[in-house]
Amino acid sequence: VWPFRRKVRASSGRLTRLLVILAVILALCAAGFFLLPAGRALFEDTRDKLGKPVPITPVTTTATTESARHPATNTTDGVRNSYWGTSPGASVTYTFRTPFRLVDVIITNGAGFTPKEYATQGRALEMDLEVTTSSGEKKTKKITLADKAGTHTIVTAFSDVKTVRLTLNSPAGLTQGRQLALAEVEFFKRS
């Protein structure tokens, strides 16, 4: 019967089929190449969420300015009612022994954890978080904090972190005789 027994020439459509297959393979390779960074970020983000954050303590804490009674080391002493006293625009740098994946930063802003302690000094409502990797690359994140006592958890996703610098901006409650205060900064790495 005619429609079912057509004569087909040899190699009919083989070249077209081959070109289509090669085009599909090339498109898949290109998509894989261009989507690899997004896939890697998604993979790392998933690992961050599935793992339990573990606290990590810096080996050194240095500041651009500090008062004698309220040094920058008060931000990592584990006590939330002591603080680093400084002026607007000052920064504190935390250096770590080995590079790690920074997952979270918990900031206790102001002079302390309770509302009464919090209101005794000025506090920063904005901070610049600058991370330096072991290769020297710098990454920055702008942080906005609520003007209230307690902790503020900042979710980060920085790999290969060696140092962290916090710069205090946008002071609130800073009047005559008061300092800009930062009570505690806690760092968490991926487990």
Regions found by a protein language model. Give the residues of each.
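Intrinsically disordered, low-complexity terminal tails and linkers
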Residues: 23-29
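Extended extracellular/luminal ectodomain segments enriched in beta-structured repeat modules
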Residues: 89, 97-106, 161
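Beta-strand residues in well-ordered beta-sheet regions across diverse protein folds
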Residues: 95, 106-108, 167
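A short beta-strand element within beta-rich, extracytoplasmic domains
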Residues: 101-119
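Trp- and acidic/polar-enriched beta-sheet ligand-binding modules for extracellular glycan
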Residues: 21, 113-191
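Beta-strand-enriched, solvent-exposed domains that form extended recognition/catalytic surfaces
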Residues: 79, 103-106, 138
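Exposed beta-strand and adjacent loop surfaces of beta-rich binding modules
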Residues: 91, 102, 124-128
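Disordered, acidic Ser/Thr/Pro-rich linker "stalks" and the adjacent N-terminal cap
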Residues: 1-18, 29-97, 115-119, 188
